[in-house]
């Protein structure tokens, strides 16, 4: 009897220690570990340009809103001003999303900071264009960030990551071949996660994936496909299981063979569920993060 009680007590101590360890890790560290360990027990939700339905895309307010709703990762776009300030904006010019005009690369930061952001319907708001540093400090310890368009000046981006202590937040991605990625970003890959983007409609896609597995062993692949007849996505679900997580985008038809967010309004099982159950998706980038999180929680696939 004493032996049984001792074993039970030891098990309780181990469970308590594990729980305590998880609680001491930041939210960002927990998500990063999920990536690094290829954890398939839940689905990572990525908010495309943050919560742009409620606030201007790539704004601090959209970022904070996404954090508050429980998003795991943000997809944010980086541009550089004429005087070298790294800032958030998708387009290379100011016209669509601000009250200004002209190319960002031809405009100094002191002029951009005077502008107001527009929402997705073109209405002028009170919100301002953020710098990348502003966003990194806001996100620190709270959420992962997928930086898009940042590879063009990644030396400068990395310096900013080190300055703010946020190298562990970042997922970089791109469509370059494995050897080129290794040559270009090799010195950063121990600190920053790199994820290849592969269009599986292309005949060379399977070889490209194999090259990455041999050269870099990426924690995840972003797969894009537009051909609903293709068997490659289902094959990748089997081939990559236990090796790399699979990321799919539910943004537009041509990225996901029609299994997009707006279709999920009526049929979440046929869109999100299909990608999770049939294609092995464990990372989903969405324009409807709140709806996706609610669906995943109903299936115990998200906290």
Protein language model regions, located:
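Bacterial Sec-dependent N-terminal signal peptides
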Residues: 1-27
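Phosphate-group recognition and catalysis centered on beta-loop-alpha active-site segments
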Residues: 18-303
């Amino acid at each position: 009897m004493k032996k049984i009680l001792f074993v039970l007590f030891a098990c309780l101590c181990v469970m308590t220690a594990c729980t305590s360890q998880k609680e001491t890790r930041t939210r960002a560290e927990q998500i990063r570990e999920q990536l690094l360990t290829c954890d398939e027990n839940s689905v990572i939700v990525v908010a495309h340009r943050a919560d742009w339905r409620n606030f201007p895309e790539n704004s601090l307010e959209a970022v904070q809103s996404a954090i508050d709703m429980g998003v795991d990762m943000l997809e944010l776009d980086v541009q550089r001003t004429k005087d070298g300030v790294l800032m958030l904006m998708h387009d290379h010019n100011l016209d669509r999303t601000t009250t200004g005009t002209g190319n960002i690369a031809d405009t100094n930061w002191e002029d951009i900071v005077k502008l107001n952001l527009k929402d997705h319907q073109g209405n002028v708001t009170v919100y301002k264009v953020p710098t990348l540093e502003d966003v990194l400090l806001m996100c620190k310890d709270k959420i992962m960030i997928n930086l898009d368009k940042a590879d063009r000046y990644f030396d400068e981006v990395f310096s900013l990551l080190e300055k703010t202590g946020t190298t562990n937040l970042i997922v970089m991605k791109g469509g370059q071949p494995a050897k080129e990625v290794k040559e270009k970003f090799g010195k950063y890959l121990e600190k920053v996660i790199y994820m290849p983007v592969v269009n599986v409609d292309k005949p060379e896609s399977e070889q490209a994936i194999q090259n990455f597995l041999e050269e870099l062993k990426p924690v995840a692949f972003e797969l894009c496909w537009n051909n609903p007849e293709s068997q490659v996505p289902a094959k990748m679900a089997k081939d990559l299981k236990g090796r790399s997580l699979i990321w799919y985008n539910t943004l537009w038809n041509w990225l996901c063979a029609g299994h997009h967010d707006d279709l999920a309004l009526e049929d979440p099982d046929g869109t999100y569920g299909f990608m999770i159950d049939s294609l092995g998706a464990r990372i989903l980038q969405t324009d409807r993060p709140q709806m996706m999180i609610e669906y995943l929680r109903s299936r115990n696939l998200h906290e």
